[in-house]
Amino acid sequence: MENIVNGCNRGILVIFLLFSSFLLHAEKFVFTTAWTPQAEFAGYYVAKEKGFYRDVGLDVVFRSPSLTGSVYHRLETDGCDAGMFSLMAAIDIVAHGTSLVNIFQTSMNSSYLIVSRWGKNPLALRGGRLAVYMSEPNYLAFILDRKRRMNFEWVFFTGNINVFLSGGVDAMAVVSYSEFLLLRQAGFEMKEGSLFRFKDHGYNIQENGVYVKSDYFESHPEQVRRFAAASRRGWEWAALHPEETLDIVMGYVRRENVQTNRVIQRLMLEEILRLQIDSDSGRREFRVRPDMVRRACLLMRDFGMIDREVSYQELMGRTKRLGVDN
């Protein structure tokens, strides 16, 4: 019996040493998300906690942006290996000289909408005060302002709905998985006629994806491929196990003392998963759509945000620049 026990102990020790050796050789991959922990990033947290990243030899470390360390600043200064940007933000960055490559895409639809404070059609609010986020240019709101000659007075806010509820603005640009849910939870009545959903008016452009600098993409092809595969596995698992996924999300929320609750995070997860479904195929495709890249570039160029087109091939790391090496 003693020999059997000793044999079992030796077997356990060997397994532990092999596992420890694997962890020691896992490659560190630092990923800065677009915001502090929330269900918007659930699939990545799942991939970490369920060992999907570890299974492919990656030790993924999450970082959150701050007022002094934006996603772009951290990526540009090598403070992280990958960062999260909306498609339009990535196009803007690339068009202005910093080469980025998309390595994984979750969003397949626009979540942006404008909510009117006084129940009016947002398009009837010419000259009104419109609240928009400070953290990233609200490209679609700026384009709408110029295209429809809205002449909005811009009021920038950092991340809560108080400026709207207090009546300090006439409308607010929000995303359907965050501020829109907070307004509902606060009991604010939003009739469909008081909403402008960008996706329903020719502005359905994908949002957040994961990007690396082109030199990292070229020097670490296996790492980005493995990160994408494990991330997709995490999101697919999250869609099938929402309650356990929320347990994982709330663990991250508590560790960083984020003020939220499970109810709002559940609603956010449901909406994020809905936004991942492609409107044409009805499936989660985890890809950048070339037609949306072209649409975004056309809008941004027409309204002076960029001075050149950024091609789909360029964003995917298949060519350096439109018209070069195609």
Predicted feature residues:
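Secondary-structure end/capping motifs
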Residues: 220-305
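Pocket-lining segment of extracytoplasmic ligand-binding domains
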Residues: 88-89, 157-163, 167-258
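Short, glycine-/small- and polar/acidic-enriched structural segments
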Residues: 28-157, 163-174, 196-198
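Bacterial N-terminal signal peptides that target proteins for export
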Residues: 2-12
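Conserved C-terminal helix/tail region of periplasmic/extracytoplasmic solute-binding proteins
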Residues: 293-326
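N-terminal signal peptide c-region/cleavage motif recognized by signal peptidases
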Residues: 20-21
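Boundary at the C-terminal end of the N-terminal hydrophobic targeting segment
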Residues: 24-26
